Amino acid sequence: MGHVSSKLVMTMKRTYSRYAQQGLALLGKSIRLGRLQHRITAQELAERIGVSRSTLQRIEKGDAKVEIGLVFEAAAIVGIKLFDADDRTITGMLSRVDDRIALLPKHVYKAGKQVEDDF
């Protein structure tokens, strides 16, 4: 018998909502604007992020397939404040979200069948 891989790779075309697409485009263009305003070349910013120039171009075009950490790092380097907050505010926000998550169940389950008890 032949060997069957336990990993099946499925390629699916992912679609994003208009809101997500516009948000990515806005963030990408904002990164480009910040880079130009700070007089940072594409090559310099790419090196600081640790990516190729082509990956930086994808970031600036709002490509949804670029790792979010790279996009956030590019934004931080060019001075874009994400979440409209500074480091201390973000730390406080993280703490509050952690507190709220701690109050919720660890897992979410689909509701089961309801019992018909109307006789």
Sequence positions of predicted segments:
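Intrinsically disordered, low-complexity and often Lys/Arg-enriched segments
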Residues: 1-15, 117
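Short alpha-helical DNA-recognition segment
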Residues: 39-55
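DNA major-groove recognition helix of helix-turn-helix/homeodomain DNA-binding modules
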Residues: 67-85
